[in-house]
From Swiss-Prot:
Protein name as annotated: Mitochondrial distribution and morphology protein 34
Compositionally skewed regions (Basic residues) per UniProt: 360-373
Region Disordered: start-end pairs: 210-233, 301-403, 479-515
Composition bias type Polar residues, residue spans: 335-345, 484-493
GO cellular component terms, semicolon-separated: ERMES complex
Amino acid sequence: MAFNFNWSPLMADAGFYTRAQDLLTTALNKSPKPPIIVDDIVVTELNLGSIPPELEILEIGDLAEDRFRGIFKMSYSGDAFLTLKTRVQANPLNTYLITRPAYASPKPLAAASGLTIPLQITLSNFRLSGFVILVFSKQKGITVVFRNDPLESLKVSSTFDSIPSVRDYLQREIEGQLRILFMDELPAIIHRLSLRLWVPEYRGLDAEARESPAASASGPGEDPLLSPPKDPVDASGNLLSSADIASLSLDSGVEMHSLFSQKNLLRLAALTNSQRTLSLFTPSIREVVFRAWTGCADQGEGAASGVVSPGSPVLSRTHSHISSPLSSLQDASSVLSLQNRSTTPGSSFSGYGLSLGAGRHSKTRPTRKRKKRVVDLRKHNKPADAESVSADSTFTESTTPPTVFSSSVIQEEANDDPVTPPMSPETTMRIPNRQHRFSTSEDKGKLRASVAQQLTYTQPSHSTLHAQRANHCPMIPLSADGAKTSSQQQPISHGSYLAPREKSHEASSAYESNANRSITDAVPNSSILEQAWMMKMANEIARRIQEGKFAANNNYPGAWEQARARTPPPAYGQ
């Protein structure tokens, strides 16, 4: 179904074109303009022509005397035209610099000066085609919505038609702006026009809106000099007196200074400087990055000294390692001893200076005590046996004083991973104090001999075992000459003492336990102190028997044969 428009009422109303021009001018300046346009776009002439658009009704949703809703197919190729005036920038370099940030600009001087030229554009020969949703109501006006882009083509005539590049550029830009106008702004313009035509309430509001700007422009302006601030200052920040304020006037030819309060100026200055500090009152400004600066005094001290203050935290690379419980305790004790020793002013930097200048791949690390496992495989029945374990001392080649500790019995699990013994001697050696043990008095030697006789009398089976061991490996004498004799023996290879290691430990442990049991059975009525002393002597005799066995096959004379003959940790025995 089709019908004809009565286009004459729109042509007869002269006020319609005036209102349409104002609405089009507002709509064209509302959207962001291209940078080449440096002035407002003003609609100077508007004519809808004598040819109405063609409408084809596709659907009617609601039909009554005062309302209508339907979907149309519109096509227009009439003689309507529109004339616009504005000013454009003729220097393309100026336009380029406006659209680029300041840090990326080459900053030309005279070449970047602007050159504005007035421009008049006439739009004609419109070709429109699209689907329109039309809703009419006398109370709500006319609502027109385009479901697609209706603009097909138009003709643009301007002042720069003689320049092809400028003509093509204007053609593209204006077509883009008109497409936005038809889809977004034109429905709102038609709705406001319909409200002014059919709704009396909006007509009265429109009249009041036109009268209010004229009344405000004709009325007297507000004089800021009537109520000056309490502490007025001029543009340079100097305080103004009441006489200076009285001499100022709005109509005077002298340059008018803005009167600001001193407090406001201080706040503005603090606001400007807050973007370069770590102030908590820095305002949150969008798309702004604040640069944090340190104080000049802090920078001067850091540059002069060149050494980081120990009070400040130091970021250093941390290396993790896996250690046994014994080594962890030793490391903790060494750290505590280092902290205790660093109380003097001369050594206050010892714990901190180790991490100074440590880079990402630096090789300088704090000296750490080498892990040394001291394992005692002998079995003890009473806590009093632990006194006999502190026989050796540990000497560590380090910058710190040597730490002497008594090793305790530690049960370690066998490690399945093969461990290669070190090729070079370690810095930490266990040196048995044989000289101290061999320098005992003759009275103690006689007393030990009496204890041995008691053991022989109490346990004849053990004395037989003692005699058999003496035949194979002679005993070490208890005098100082025995130490000299043992030091003249020849060394043997490492493989010679690895084979009978387990058997010797089993035999010594069995003999020690039997000796302890025999002493306990022999003197049941003696005091606790005598029993403890006798058990200590029995342990000493058992240890001497074991040392004598090793000394029989030892070919390494000197003070290091016992260190070589000692049983290594379980990892070396696998």
